[in-house]
Amino acid sequence: MGSNLLMIRSSSATSGGVRMGSGTRPTLTLKDAEAIELTAKGVMAVAPYTSQTQQLTYGNQNWSTSVAGTTDSYLFIRNYEVIDGRSFIPEDIKNNAKVAIIGNTVSTELFGDMNPIDKTLRIGNAPVRVIGLLKTKGESGMGMDQDDLVFIPITTAQKKVFGTDFPGTVKMINVKAQSEEALASAQEDIYDILRRRHRIGKSQEDDFEIRNLAEMQETIKSSAKTMSLLLGAIASVSLLVGGIGIMNIMLVS
């Protein structure tokens, strides 16, 4: 995915004095994403994102998977490629079009060997027409099937498929900076934009959090290195203990 990516989420909500997970207090909106795209410096692409697990049906076939509402920019940011049909166009977002782009796993489970393009499946009770099929990506480094998903326009998700108590909100905003060098300044600019838009005072806490993918990757690498050293130490101790045990048995013999 590259290391010039930022992920912006709503900050944690508090329930009964207990701090919940990030994104539990919806504060980010589609308008926030538009403002970042229009005014933030050093930004190449911006993609609002929201998702739910939904039941898909086509004829007698059904499949449960993640359905994400977003824009064509998300496919660009996350390196998804449409190999048959087309991607989203601005009119799909503007008109809340009931269209979908699907991964290969979903295509196989619902349509078998048939070409899914122009077929109509149901997401819950909402009929949507398949306009695009994604190139196979296989499993991620964490073992997740990257082909088991459906993309629909963000506005369609908000207004016609998901339903929400917080109209216009999104779970996440993904941002791709123009380069790794531009990442830090873009992050600062986005931070200022969101604080202004959300009318957060100087003494008030942020109601959002920005995660730098480069920093996250370094944290993962550091954790993996620490775990490797720990496992090595455990193995060494096990060998030492085993060796002492064998030596004691030989001495007794």
PLM feature spans:
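Short, flexible, glycine-rich and Lys/Arg-enriched loop motifs at helix boundaries
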Residues: 13-23, 165-167, 195-207
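Hydrophobic, regular-secondary-structure patches
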Residues: 1-66, 73, 108-109, 181, ...
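Mid-to-C-terminal secondary-structure elements
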Residues: 73-88, 97-201
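A hydrophobic alpha-helix feature that marks transmembrane segments and, especially
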Residues: 228-253
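Hydrophobic alpha-helical segments typical of transmembrane helices
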Residues: 32-35, 106, 153, 169, ...
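Peri-transmembrane interface segments
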Residues: 174, 182-183, 187-190, 201-235
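Extracytoplasmic
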Residues: 3-5, 23, 31, 41, ...
